[in-house]
Amino acid sequence: MEFFNILQSSCNDVNLDFNDKKYNQFISYKNLIQEWNKKVNLTAIVEDEEIIKKHFIDCIKIFKASPIGEAKSLIDIGTGAGFPGIPIKILREDIKITLLDSLQKRINFLNIVIGDLKLKDIQCLHGRAEDYAQEAEHRQKYDVAVSRAVANLAVLSEFCIPFVKKGGYFIAMKGPSVEEEITVATKSIEVLGGKIEDIIKIDIEDTDLKHNLVIIKKVKETEKKYPRKPGIIKKDPLK
């Protein structure tokens, strides 16, 4: 019951209900990660306790950002093994979620997870954020965009902010040192229609992990020319 108690304690910390069903979904998810990681590079974190703490607990902490608890629709960009989108869905069955990733093998894995965990109102998209953000079905259609992907904030913002409707939020899950990234990215966030509203510091219990949630509110619509063409965003981030 150790893992149940760890997960329950983390959920209590963000005022979320936790029960046997959710626990079993998390354990099934963990087992699938370990099984699939032998053939698909999903994560370098493979031990039971590390997956629970460094992936699942880290994702639960995103509920410290109030928009996660209020949103009706969410897109997780560069979701990888499903972080944080799958944990959010386990804990909030009522939210409609889209998982976006550029690697088909990871999408195959995520579809297996969705089926095995019997998750509803969740879809996977294979492709680039730059392309989907220009499609009417996805552009400025989501209450919240989230990303735990490894990229600097200026680059992530151009990938993610165009998906968010005016009045919605982009929440970036960043490492312990974000001050310099924020300084560099502030102008690009503004150009894309966003404004930094808050930075929430996160500590993961019983680990050395310290993270930051950068909360960006969409205050105006994104100009049609953004995001720019694939490849340009990383080569020439907005300044």
UniProtKB/Swiss-Prot annotation:
Going by the UniProt record, its keywords in alphabetical order are: Cytoplasm, Methyltransferase, rRNA processing, S-adenosyl-L-methionine, Transferase
Q: Does the keyword Membrane apply?
A: no
Question: In the Enzyme Commission scheme, what number(s) does this protein have?
Answer: 2.1.1.-
EC primary class: transferase
Question: For binding S-adenosyl-L-methionine, which residues are annotated in this chain's numbering?
Answer: G78, F83, A129, E130, R148
Q: Name one Pfam family in it.
A: GidB
Q: Which GO terms describe its cellular component?
A: cytosol
InterPro entries named in the record: rRNA_ssu_MeTfrase_G (IPR003682), SAM-dependent_MTases_sf (IPR029063)
Q: Name one GO molecular function term.
A: rRNA (guanine-N7-)-methyltransferase activity
Q: Does the keyword Iron-sulfur apply?
A: no
Q: Where in the cell is it found?
A: Cytoplasm
Functional summary from the UniProt entry: Specifically methylates the N7 position of a guanine in 16S rRNA.
Query: What does the similarity note say?
Result: Belongs to the methyltransferase superfamily. RNA methyltransferase RsmG family.
Protein name, as recorded: Ribosomal RNA small subunit methyltransferase G
